[in-house]
Amino acid sequence: IGYAVRRWCLKRRRIFTTSYHTRFPEYLAARLPVPVDWTYAVLRRFHNGGAGCMVATASLEAELEGRGFRHLMRWSRGVDADLFRPDRRSAEIADLPRPIHLYVGRVAVEKNIGAFLDLKLSGSKVVVGDGPALDALRRAHPEVTFLGARVGEALADIYATSDCFVFPSRTDTFGVVMLEAMSSGVPVAAFPVAGPRDVIGDTGAGVLDEDLGRAVEAALMIPRDHCREVALRHSWRAATQQFLDNVVAAQKGCAASALV
């Protein structure tokens, strides 16, 4: 669909923008023997045809710029703070041994979930999400509570009932699930890589460490109200305004180029 719309716009000289959400080159390389540089070349050609390419973080912007992507614009993410809040509770996991360590997301090889499930932690591990690796992980880790996919209030209840959100991915461009956890008053433990570095950084709402188990233990000491406070800086209103500003800037940029 993206290529079809791109062709339509280029043929009719219509201004358009794109957005870069997923590390397709790395995801593809994790499954098939396709060189990362090949896939980036295809994506670079696609995105450089537009008047602007929106990216979620400073880290991703710098990386793509180094790979030859042009007209990059920052477009951060927002969280529904009315839905994801600390006062909720989930009957599904409330009686599990504490602390409850939570993962939410696609259950697939590129998410590096094994790094979380292999940790020796007290309490319980809960995985929310579906994906191609779900059945295999269920068999390999019978001690883990796999809930499958959850959305809306059921998901929000699970977040708020947990004690630590573990984000083991090394390839996500942002990780909005971290914002959802923080908005629910839950601290984050993650690796110090792009994505977590941009969302957590030095906010104190989580801990980044190459030793993920050590990050979890430290994150459990973070006050829940501080996590909520940090998440509230990422509103849907602010994200929407940033998107609209980018669209206007792209239009003005093309108009200025036409005058040269």
What are these model-derived regions, one by one?
Residues 15-17, 24-45, 55:
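Nucleotide-sugar donor phosphate/pyrophosphate-binding loop at the beta->alpha transition
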Residues 40-89:
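Donor nucleotide-sugar binding/catalytic pocket of nucleotide-sugar-dependent glycosyltransferases
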Residues 47, 149, 157-162, 243:
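Short alpha-helical donor nucleotide-sugar binding micro-motif in glycosyltransferases
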Residues 89-91, 221-255:
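A charged, aromatic-enriched C-terminal amphipathic alpha-helix characteristic of glycosyltransferases
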Residues 92-126:
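Conserved donor-binding/catalytic core segment of Leloir-type glycosyltransferases
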Residues 134-153:
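Nucleotide-activated donor-binding/catalytic signature segment of Leloir-type glycosyltransferases, i.e.
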Residues 170:
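Aromatic "clamp/platform" in nucleotide-sugar-dependent glycosyltransferases that forms part
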Residues 178, 183, 187-190:
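Short hydrophobic beta-strand element within catalytic cores of glycosyltransferases
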